[in-house]
Swiss-Prot record:
The family this protein is said to belong to: Belongs to the long (4 C-C) scorpion toxin superfamily. Sodium channel inhibitor family.
Keyword DNA repair: no
This protein's name: Sodium channel toxin To13
Source organism of this protein record: Tityus obscurus (Amazonian scorpion)
GO cellular component terms, A-Z: extracellular region
Amino acid sequence: MKTLFLIITSFILLEVEGIKNGYPRDSKGCTFECGQDAKHGDDYCDKMCKTTLKGEGGDCDFEYAECWCDNIPDTVVTWKNKEPKCKQI
């Protein structure tokens, strides 16, 4: 019982934030386009996901020509593939 209490208290004190994967949206509600160049697109997305969004990394999903990010904070708004790629948020 004490162990459970310590674990719960630790999470509260650390304010653990959830993570998710997805196509992030910018401040205008648009996804990050990465184009058709595989090398440039993957480098751009990986850097943007790590630096701007504090994720683990990312790459260009060439099916949608949009950046996909791994392990980004839950607070980042992401695109659902049935929505328009630019949407007011």
